[in-house]
Amino acid sequence: MTPYILRRLMFLPVVLWAVSLIVFVLMRAVPGDPAAAIAGEKAPREVRDRIRRERGFDRPIPVQYGLYMGRLLRGDLGESFKHSNEKVSTQIARKLPHTIELTLAAMAVALAGGLLLGILSAVYKGGWIDAASMTVALAGVSVPVFWLGLLFILAFGSMLPVSGNLDANYFPPDRTGFVLIDTLLSGNGAMFLDAVRHVLMPALVLSTIPLAMTARITRASMLEVLGSDYIRTARAKGASPSRVVLVHALRNAALPIVTLLGLEFGYLLGGAVLTETVFDWDGMGTYILSSVRETEYESIGGAVLVLACTFVGVNLVVDLLYSFIDPRIRHGSPQA
């Protein structure tokens, strides 16, 4: 294991601790009695007193944070008092795979579309293809996701499902929590196709801004690489235009794109809240929104903490991938 990977792994606990501290402070910053916020203002006094004792709200703040960290280390994110005291971790375990599934689908669309537009813009710089591609990219950044979602529903609602993860008549085996994977493993082709049709529209809507960002970064990186000496050498040696672009240029232009992936994943996790609301997607976005409406502060805190840790974990993977793509980083070169 290289020193670079070791350094990244050493900082991971510090980052996760900082995330937990921020979530704790935000939860304690809620005005009023936290026990009443959890159990509800109309809850009996005995219930609120019991919550104060169980959750340590009657103790000093440093002690409360110590108890909070102790529960986190045991995997205890709290309970949903308005849903029969069900564990928040159990609820999140049902919702998180759906959001990750939507996020990965949107990232696949953004990466494929962004690379295509960026490469075409760089190869045909100054032409109509370049102008059209960058216009699409600019529109993708400018249009609000919720408004675009409503337009998609109006335009394609007669052809594609506009709500939910799967048709109510299908019941796939719950093996992984990911609807696409579970329907595929079931061997029912019609059910899998229905799952694909359900994820298609929200994934397209959610991917618009990351697609535009990928296209612009790819174009800028490709233009820089295409003007380098080794590209001119490859062309002079008779390499085909497609090989020059896809093998020589794209490989060396990939570093900024890989760096962008981690940031895009974070945006997609945040953007999923709006997208899931528009398309009634049963994921973390709708879970957080319903928790806000029901003043389930422990559910909100648990969801935010899990999403933040997911984002940190994905960025760690991207950093490690970056180190394998660029050996200078892996070996600690000062030129990196």
Regions found by a protein language model. Name each.
Residues 9, 51, 61-77, 88, ...:
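Hydrophobic alpha-helical segments of integral membrane proteins
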Residues 15-66, 156-191:
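Hydrophobic alpha-helical transmembrane segments of membrane transport/permease proteins
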Residues 58-115:
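An internal, D/E-rich "acidic patch" concept
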